[in-house]
Amino acid sequence: GSEMCIRDSLITPTDAGIQAAVRAHMAVAAYADPAFPEQSYAGAWMVIEGFEEVDDEFLERIFQRCHGQPWEIARTKRCVIRELSLEDLPALEKLYQKEGVTWRLDADGERIPGFIEPLFAKEKEKKYQQAYITNMYGYYGYGMWLVFDKASGELIGRAGLEHREFPDAVELELGYLIDPDRQGQGLATEVCQAILAFAREELDFPRVNALTDQKNVASVALLQKLGFYYLEDTDVSGSRTQRYIYEFS
């Protein structure tokens, strides 16, 4: 039949099946079966159109999504890349407090340069990340992830793929940050290569963008090493930045 149940995960073509699974606290995905038209699929974590990609990993991911467990995205030689969970916020805060990571204002209100936007105040950041987990990870299956040292389990960075609106289209943008104490070890290259491989294999975009300040020599060198080429200077959020492109040819 068109219903499948493995390890507390159910794939079903009917709203009745979905509601039964929800009541039983099971992870559930809907199968768009033409034999059961006019279903709403309310309560399902995703809707599939066939069983070609359904394997143990797929069912495990439905289970994790339903139970609020972060997905692991990739493993490199030295790192684990995975989704953020709310339990990671204290470690993320610690990383963002390091010198030069985020821009901030000095006593006179002048902007002290840094790499990225600072976090919100604690409760606001928690609400923001909860919505991000639900809406970005849950709906798109990608976003900004966390980078952990494979050996120690320590949080050493943040990297991933976001949407960026350009005048002609919404495209993917690569973002990355490595703990200042761990820079110069080739970790950013390792992590970004894994993310580009993920984008090539899993996502339906022809290319990935990266935005950087031309004064950020290390970032420009990294992008060139990864195979990005310079496209144009552009204005983003009121500041002039360089746009680089990586094509999936």
Predicted regions and their residues:
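Conserved beta-strand-loop-alpha-helix junction that forms the acyl-donor binding cleft
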Residues: P13, P34, A210-V220
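Conserved active-site alpha-helix within GNAT-family acetyltransferase domains
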Residues: Q19, R23, E154, K215-L231
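Structural motif
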Residues: R23-A24, A42, I156, E202-L203, ...
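Short low-complexity, flexible loop/linker segments enriched in glycine and/or proline
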Residues: G43-V47, Q224, Y246-F248
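GNAT-family acyltransferases
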Residues: E49-D181, Q193-E202, R207, L211, ...
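Glycine-rich acyl-CoA binding loop
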Residues: G184-T189
